[in-house]
From Swiss-Prot:
<comment type="pathway">
    <text>Isoprenoid biosynthesis; isopentenyl diphosphate biosynthesis via DXP pathway; isopentenyl diphosphate from 1-deoxy-D-xylulose 5-phosphate: step 4/6.</text>
</comment>
<comment type="function">
    <text>Involved in the biosynthesis of isopentenyl diphosphate (IPP) and dimethylallyl diphosphate (DMAPP), two major building blocks of isoprenoid compounds. Catalyzes the conversion of 4-diphosphocytidyl-2-C-methyl-D-erythritol 2-phosphate (CDP-ME2P) to 2-C-methyl-D-erythritol 2,4-cyclodiphosphate (ME-CPP) with a corresponding release of cytidine 5-monophosphate (CMP).</text>
</comment>
<feature type="binding site">
    <location>
        <position position="8"/>
    </location>
    <ligand>
        <name>a divalent metal cation</name>
    </ligand>
</feature>
<feature type="binding site">
    <location>
        <begin position="8"/>
        <end position="10"/>
    </location>
    <ligand>
        <name>4-CDP-2-C-methyl-D-erythritol 2-phosphate</name>
    </ligand>
</feature>
<dbReference type="GO" id="GO:0016114">
    <property type="term" value="P:terpenoid biosynthetic process"/>
</dbReference>
<dbReference type="InterPro" id="IPR036571">
    <property type="entry name" value="MECDP_synthase_sf"/>
</dbReference>
<comment type="subunit">
    <text>Homotrimer.</text>
</comment>
<feature type="binding site">
    <location>
        <begin position="34"/>
        <end position="35"/>
    </location>
    <ligand>
        <name>4-CDP-2-C-methyl-D-erythritol 2-phosphate</name>
    </ligand>
</feature>
<feature type="binding site">
    <location>
        <begin position="132"/>
        <end position="135"/>
    </location>
    <ligand>
        <name>4-CDP-2-C-methyl-D-erythritol 2-phosphate</name>
    </ligand>
</feature>
<feature type="binding site">
    <location>
        <position position="139"/>
    </location>
    <ligand>
        <name>4-CDP-2-C-methyl-D-erythritol 2-phosphate</name>
    </ligand>
</feature>
<feature type="site" description="Transition state stabilizer">
    <location>
        <position position="133"/>
    </location>
</feature>
<feature type="binding site">
    <location>
        <begin position="56"/>
        <end position="58"/>
    </location>
    <ligand>
        <name>4-CDP-2-C-methyl-D-erythritol 2-phosphate</name>
    </ligand>
</feature>
<feature type="site" description="Transition state stabilizer">
    <location>
        <position position="34"/>
    </location>
</feature>
<feature type="binding site">
    <location>
        <position position="10"/>
    </location>
    <ligand>
        <name>a divalent metal cation</name>
    </ligand>
</feature>
<keyword id="KW-0456">Lyase</keyword>
<keyword id="KW-0414">Isoprene biosynthesis</keyword>
<feature type="binding site">
    <location>
        <position position="142"/>
    </location>
    <ligand>
        <name>4-CDP-2-C-methyl-D-erythritol 2-phosphate</name>
    </ligand>
</feature>
Length: 159
C-alpha cells in the first residue's frame, strides 16, 4: 500500500466559471488557470501521481502545452488514473478538503463525490469531499482564492 498527498491553490478571477470536483458551482468569479482550474481535481491528480511515485501534475500536463488549454480536469484525472494503473496500482480511497470562504459548497458536495467516483472508477463510498473556511483568515478568508488538499490510498495490483 502507498499513500499519496496532493495540494493545489488557484486565485479567483472574474469572467470564468467556478468548477470544483467536476461540478460548476454558481459564483461571481471562477479560478485562474490554464485548464478549467479545478483545484480539487488537481490536488487529487497530484496525490495519485505522488502515491505512485510518478511526479506531479505539472510534469504530465504542463501549462505550457496548448493541448491542455481550457481542458476539463475530469479528463486530466482520468488520464492520471490510467497512468497510476499502468504503474501497477489501483485506488482504494480518496479523501479531500476544499478551503474557501465563499461560496458555501454543501449543496454540491455529493455531486462532486459522484463525479470523482465516475472519473476514478470508485464507488462514492470510497470518495470523500469536505469543505471548510479559514474563519476569514489568509487568502482564502479574504476570498482571493481556493485551496484543496487530497490524500489517496493506493494498493498494488499484484503485478
Amino acid at each position: 500500500m502507498r499513500v499519496g498527498f496532493g495540494y493545489d491553490v488557484h486565485a479567483f478571477v472574474e469572467g470564468r466559471p467556478l468548477v470544483l470536483g467536476g461540478v460548476k458551482v454558481p459564483h461571481d468569479r471562477g479560478l485562474l488557470g490554464h485548464s478549467d482550474a479545478d483545484v480539487l481535481l488537481h490536488a487529487i491528480c497530484d496525490a495519485l501521481l505522488g502515491g505512485a511515485a510518478l511526479g506531479d501534475i505539472g510534469r504530465h500536463f504542463p501549462d505550457t502545452d496548448p493541448r491542455f488549454k481550457g481542458i476539463s480536469s475530469l479528463l486530466l484525472l482520468r488520464q492520471t488514473v490510467e497512468l497510476v494503473r499502468r504503474a501497477g496500482f489501483r485506488i482504494a480511497n480518496i479523501d479531500t478538503t476544499l478551503v474557501l470562504q465563499k461560496p458555501r459548497l454543501a449543496p454540491y458536495i455529493a455531486r462532486m463525490a459522484e463525479e470523482i467516483g465516475r472519473a476514478t472508477d470508485l464507488p462514492v463510498s470510497s470518495v470523500n469531499v469536505k469543505a471548510t473556511t479559514t474563519e476569514k483568515l489568509g487568502f482564502a478568508g479574504r476570498e482571493e482564492g481556493v485551496a484543496a488538499y487530497a490524500v489517496v490510498l493506493l494498493r498494488s495490483d499484484g503485478r
